[in-house]
């Protein structure tokens, strides 16, 4: 009846009254559990020499088993090995310490602590220098890399903030991928005088005298020197073309004085050279191809004149 009442009370507390079948099952389950417990107790009394009371609970059985295994179980439930009695503070917090050491402490060591290390501390190592937009004036952030703190302290405070532009430089160096890409894109349309390749045979013309708009039959844009143009596409194309012409020229101006006959013939064939010769007159021509060593002086004068015209100066001749 007690078991049935207990089952009914449990059902009423949950909001539903157990049925008659459920109450019978609960009674059978409780009788089976008590029968098994009685057999265990009788076996321990008969064969294990355990001093168990007639009506005992499971705590008495656990205490007896601990005593047989060499443990000490006090009246308040404190359990420890013989000869290893812990202090009173540890005894009072023993259940809490066991649960903390087994469940709470290993989880921060395995999950919480290693995760900031690769994400926060690894970022200054992967990038050699901190980003200007993420500059932190707090010296504690540079403890791992002291030289970064020294660099930051050496920068004057009155300087304006660093501005990073995505525009390409006006005249990129020869090692720049922009100049290398512009060299590959050089076509016949980009060359002066309708795509004539004879201009590449005169390195001094390419360096000192870009073609003048007044001395050409076509209307193409001359490969002038880029003058700090802010536009990205024009500056990249002109600077690449200028570097392409400049790379074909030798380092010494006397290289043009050595090649006498071939240079005169090429000047006759190229429109650019012809326009320069017609502008200066026939005073430098000798017997249709016989070139004297001072031919280079004439070429240099033509180059200087065209360079001044390109930059917007007046037409002055030496």
Curated annotation (Swiss-Prot):
The UniProt record lists the keyword DNA-binding: yes
One Pfam family of this chain: BES1_N
Source organism (scientific name): Arabidopsis thaliana (Mouse-ear cress)
Protein name: BES1/BZR1 homolog protein 2
Family designation: Belongs to the BZR/LAT61 family.
UniProt feature, compositional bias: Gly residues: 1-13
Signal peptide region: none
Region ranges (Required for DNA-binding): 16-97
Gene Ontology terms for molecular function: DNA binding; DNA-binding transcription factor activity
Name of the coding gene: BEH2
């Amino acid at each position: 009846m007690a078991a049935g009442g207990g089952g009914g009370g449990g059902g009423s507390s949950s909001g539903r009254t157990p049925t008659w079948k459920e109450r019978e099952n609960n009674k059978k389950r409780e009788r089976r559990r008590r029968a098994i417990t009685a057999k265990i107790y009788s076996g321990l009394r008969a064969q294990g020499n355990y001093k168990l009371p007639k009506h005992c609970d499971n705590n008495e059985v656990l205490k007896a088993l601990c005593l047989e295994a060499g443990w000490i179980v006090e009246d308040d439930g404190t359990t420890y090995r013989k000869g290893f009695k812990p202090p009173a503070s540890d005894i009072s917090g023993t259940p809490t310490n066991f649960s903390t050491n087994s469940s709470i402490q290993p989880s921060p060591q395995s999950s919480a602590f290693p995760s900031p290390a690769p994400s926060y501390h690894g970022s200054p190592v992967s990038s050699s220098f901190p980003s200007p937009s993420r500059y932190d004036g707090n010296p504690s952030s540079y403890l791992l890399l002291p030289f970064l703190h020294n660099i930051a302290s050496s920068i004057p405070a009155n300087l304006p903030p660093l501005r990073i532009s995505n525009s390409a430089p006006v005249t990129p160096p020869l090692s720049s991928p922009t100049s290398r890409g512009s060299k590959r894109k050089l076509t016949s349309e980009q060359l002066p005088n309708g795509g004539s390749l004879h201009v590449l045979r005169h390195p001094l013309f390419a360096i000192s005298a870009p073609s003048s708009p007044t001395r050409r039959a076509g209307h193409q844009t001359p490969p002038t020197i880029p003058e700090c143009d802010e536009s990205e596409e024009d500056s990249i194309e002109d600077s690449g073309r200028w570097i392409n012409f400049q790379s074909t020229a030798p380092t010494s101006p006397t290289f043009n004085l050595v090649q006498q006959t071939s240079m005169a013939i090429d000047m006759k064939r190229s429109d650019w050279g012809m326009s320069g010769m017609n502008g200066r007159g026939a005073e430098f021509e000798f017997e249709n191809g016989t070139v004297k060593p001072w031919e280079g002086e004439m070429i240099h004068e033509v180059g200087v004149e065209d360079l001044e015209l390109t930059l917007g100066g007046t037409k002055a001749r030496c």
